[in-house]
Swiss-Prot record:
It comes from Shewanella frigidimarina (strain NCIMB 400). This is Bis(5'-nucleosyl)-tetraphosphatase, symmetrical. The gene is apaH. Hydrolyzes diadenosine 5',5'''-P1,P4-tetraphosphate to yield ADP. The keyword Transferase does not apply. Gene3D superfamilies: 3.60.21.10.
Length: 272
């Protein structure tokens, strides 16, 4: 079995298929792990979701911020962003089925035999793996309830939940988990999430901010952390235990696949 980890696809389905052809991906024996943001800025979000759903157990997906935003759009809680290309998906006859499939996907996946942890944006450095899995499970539980739109999705859009504390409870605790696992890039020196700066670290000159993966971590280096979300990194973290896979395919760059067993990076340039 080969394990392939792919960066943010964002509806770039054709590029994904070309990438999988390069490695002769075989869903009968291989697994495709996706760091989230399956949908949005590319033009083939519907095909992307249908493909991952069709893979069944051969696909291991975590939710990204754009995937969660799709739930809000489907629930009529938000209006589509002009840069998104989601009309085909939102009007598809199987949209309810696809949304329900997304709701079953977690915020974190682990591959214990290889000491791998995968989330969309990263792992808060103050969380160990037990806290990470517990907090993510609480969000997954809320997503799978009948009232998920009013109880969670409608209330997740805030930047107030920026600081972790074990004393957080209810929606505030869920918000922090969503923000940390799907939106995190830089942290303030006291550990607070920063939601504004999207630059690469080399272009960010504030002494008050550092990339989340430069803080002392309770999950690395004993584990390898796989994430996407931060396209400006272009795959560069300076840490072999922190693997960044978003390389901006939807922005005209390329889609990146990591073959775990060979420790090999394979890329596919954006077609359009």
């Amino acid at each position: 079995m080969a394990h392939y980890f792919v960066g943010d696809i964002q509806g770039c389905y054709s590029e994904l298929q070309l990438l999988l052809q390069k490695v002769a991906f075989n869903p009968s024996k291989d697994q495709l792990w996706a760091v989230g943001d399956l949908v949005a800025r590319g033009t083939e979000s519907l095909a992307t979701l249908r493909f991952f759903q069709s893979l069944q157990d051969s696909a291991k997906v975590v939710l990204g911020n754009h995937d969660l935003h799709l739930l809000a759009l489907h629930g009529k809680l938000k209006r589509p962003h002009p840069q998104d290309h989601l009309d085909e998906l939102l009007n598809a006859p199987d949209i309810d089925n696809l949304v329900n499939w997304l709701r079953q996907q977690p915020l974190v996946r682990t591959l214990p035999e290889h000491n791998i942890i995968m989330t969309h944006a990263g792992v808060p450095p103050q969380w160990d793996i037990a806290i990470l899995e517990h907090e993510a499970e609480q969000v997954s539980f809320a997503l799978q309830q009948d009232d998920y739109l009013s109880a969670l999705i409608a209330q997740m859009y805030t930047e107030d939940a920026e600081h972790w504390s074990p004393s957080l409870h209810g929606i505030d605790r869920l918000r922090y988990c969503i923000n940390a696992l799907t939106r995190m890039r830089f942290l303030h020196l006291d550990g607070r999430l920063d939601f504004k700066c999207k630059l690469p670290p080399s272009e960010q000159h504030s002494t008050e901010l550092r990339p989340w993966f430069e803080f002392a971590s309770k999950t690395a280096p004993q584990n390898t952390l796989i994430f996407g979300h931060w396209a400006a990194l272009m795959g560069q973290t300076g840490n072999p235990h922190v693997v960044a896979l978003d390389t901006g395919c939807c922005w005209g760059e390329h889609l990146t696949l990591w073959h775990l067993e060979k420790n090999e990076i394979i890329t596919q340039k954006r077609l359009i």
